[in-house]
Regions:
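Receiver (REC) domain active-site loop signature in two-component systems and cognate sites
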Residues: 55
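Receiver (REC) domain switch/output surface
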Residues: 111-120
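Acidic catalytic/metal-coordinating carboxylates
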Residues: 31-35, 59-63
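Alpha4 helix (beta4-alpha4-beta5 surface) of REC/receiver domains from two-component response regulators
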Residues: 62, 83-103, 110
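Conserved sequence signature across two-component system core domains
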Residues: 6-7, 30, 49
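Hydrophobic/aromatic residues positioned on beta-strands within the core alpha/beta folds
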Residues: 79-81
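Active-site residues of response regulator receiver
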Residues: 52
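Two-component/phosphorelay signaling modules centered on CheY-like receiver
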Residues: 10-28, 97
Length: 120
């Protein structure tokens, strides 16, 4: 599968990308929602999007809404470590705007792969 990973934290992106590549997935990375949306529009063969919710330039919720306008059926996994209001609140909002699944940071590689398996 081809998976787009959108997260402003390079260490989180690297962890996710390495986990996915070890399972023979193809990974495209973006450091914010603006870049992620651009890559999604350019690379039409993406199967799943994993996006952080709190990022500079364009937050994950806005990114999810815009992606849904382009492709209502693409699978989206929203991830969040929270911020001031706590990750649970952000993840509920992600669900409300169209994420197919949510995962609270920090998470293990095994938890990530289990979530992706549910999206397949």
């Amino acid at each position: 599968m081809k998976i787009l990973v959108i997260d402003d934290d390079p260490s989180v992106r690297k962890f996710i990308a390495t986990t996915l590549k070890n399972e023979n997935h193809t990974v495209t990375e973006a450091e914010n929602g603006v870049e992620g949306l651009k890559k999604f529009q350019e690379e039409r063969d993406i199967n799943i999007i994993i996006t952080d919710l709190i990022m500079p330039d364009k937050e994950g919720l806005e990114t999810i809404i815009e992606i849904r306008k382009i492709n209502p059926s693409i699978k989206i996994l929203a991830i969040s470590g929270g911020g001031k209001v706590g990750p649970e609140n952000f993840l509920l909002l992600a669900d409300a705007v169209g994420a197919n699944a949510t995962l609270k940071k920090p998470f293990s590689g095994q938890e990530l792969l289990m979530c992706l398996k549910l999206l397949e």
